């Protein structure tokens, strides 16, 4: 059986909405370009961009805990560095994530949007060459970057076992495929 890629997604800001991609060029040992490049850290999160280390998603705003984030759509333009945050098609914020002022605007937006659901001042974090991956580096691995794959047959099997539909996007994979 042939394998067919049915969808490709990246998540430029960890915990926020997916961006559908038509195609992507992958490099060995790398994740999708700009996938999980940024994260929005909670006030208590310690992160050193000069010496980045893996941190659990609980250190950042995320859909699993901060359900209100599902109301928003985000788009990141890698060339300009601009993140656009929208709700039902209306732009709420457009800010350059590659500049301190833009990062402050994004952090302030989410602090106001989420209100008391988050603790401490939020901040945008980034470290060149680092991806805020969902899993830490495996023993003996040569990289901590990965591309997450899901066979749609696995989703169908899960739906059959549960007796209910499952939204494949809940798994936040990069590549969905049929076959194999």
Protein language model features and the residues they cover:
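Electropositive, beta-rich accessory/interaction domains or terminal extensions
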Residues: 1-180
């Amino acid at each position: 059986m042939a394998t067919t890629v049915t969808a490709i997604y990246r998540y430029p800001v960890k915990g926020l909405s997916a961006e559908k991609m038509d195609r992507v060029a992958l490099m060995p040992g790398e994740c999708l370009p700009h996938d999980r490049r940024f994260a929005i850290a909670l006030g208590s999160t310690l992160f050193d961009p000069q010496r980045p280390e893996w941190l659990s998603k609980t250190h950042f705003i995320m859909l699993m805990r901060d359900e209100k984030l599902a109301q928003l759509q985000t788009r990141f333009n890698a060339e300009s560095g601009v993140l656009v945050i929208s709700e039902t098609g209306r732009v709420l914020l457009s800010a350059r994530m590659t500049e301190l002022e833009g990062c402050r605007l994004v952090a302030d937006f989410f602090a106001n949007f989420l209100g008391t659901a988050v603790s401490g001042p939020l901040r945008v974090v980034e470290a060149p060459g680092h991806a805020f991956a969902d899993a830490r580096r495996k023993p003996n691995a040569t990289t901590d970057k990965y591309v997450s794959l899901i066979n749609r047959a696995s989703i169908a099997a899960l739906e059959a076992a549960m007796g209910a539909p499952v939204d494949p996007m809940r798994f936040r994979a990069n590549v969905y495929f049929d076959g194999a």
